[in-house]
Amino acid sequence: MSEPVAPDGAQPAPAGATPQPLQPIAGDRPATRTVFIVSDGTGITAETFSHSILAQFEMRFRKVRMPFVDTPEKAHIAVGKINEAFHTEGVPPIVFTTLVNQEANKALRRAKAMILDMFQTFIEPLEKELGLKSTHAIGRFHQNADTEAYKNRIEAINFSLAHDDGQSHKNLQEADVILVGVSRSGKTPTSLYLAMQYGLKAANYPLIPDDFERGKLPKALYDYKPKIFGLSIDPQRLTEIRNERRPGSKYAAIENCRYEVNEAEAMMRREGIKWLSSTHKSIEEIATTILQEIKVDRDNY
């Protein structure tokens, strides 16, 4: 029986010693890995899931989105692109898939890739546990254009756009939440995310130097304090963001940013308004915190 061969430059193991497995050589694997997101619908579900999983790894990923793969023919085209990536990069791409069509799914499995099938992972065990066959309907989660929840969501988006940055005081009583904070603290993206993702009517209102001089909330908000939630931000981060918009201005100066942030936080404390710093939080984290703090009568999500 032949002895195991040591890599170049390594000393062979002493006679009688247990051979140790060879360690991977640095550089064997690419710094960036290609990820395909294959879905028979919009791909939002698969993309969200893949983002959560891949965020656990300190590595760069090149994402290729392939929505509306709802026939075997389209699956074959997808396989061609996946295999092309395999031959180019020398490593199997990672594929997240939510295909319902069994023939399309079968075709996709011929790809030279690591395939993570969300339906096979979750739906099949649930079918066994519930003793019930799933509908296997394509895009069922998103086929809601005629539902009440969908209409509420569109209405919420229109409301949030109309009430962005204090543009309108009309119908504020309809708001589920009113976000306040200094300019560029993250109010607009958070409002739109709450509207689009959860169907919440989210208005937002800027706190400006005039408010700080008066030491009071804007008059239009007096009657809606229970609906108000505040956003703050680190002054240094704020000056960086504002300089991208208006470089070298007083508006973006660090001294002014410190003043506005300090005054806004002091006002929110005086008024008993719950608030958080958006500095190191994603829009999703901010929205989740707001949902935990406010009481919403409707359930659109």
From Swiss-Prot:
GO terms for molecular function: ADP binding; ATP binding; phosphotransferase activity, phosphate group as acceptor; protein serine/threonine kinase activity. Its EC number is 2.7.11.33, 2.7.4.28. It comes from the Bacteria. Residues 1-24 have a biased composition (Low complexity). Residues 1-27 are annotated as: Disordered. Disulfide bonds: none annotated. The keyword Repeat does not apply. Keywords: Kinase, Nucleotide-binding, Serine/threonine-protein kinase, Transferase. InterPro entries: Kinase-pyrophosphorylase, PSRP. It holds the Pfam family Kinase-PPPase. Bifunctional serine/threonine kinase and phosphorylase involved in the regulation of the phosphoenolpyruvate synthase (PEPS) by catalyzing its phosphorylation/dephosphorylation. Belongs to the pyruvate, phosphate/water dikinase regulatory protein family. PSRP subfamily. This is Putative phosphoenolpyruvate synthase regulatory protein. It comes from Cupriavidus pinatubonensis (strain JMP 134 / LMG 1197).
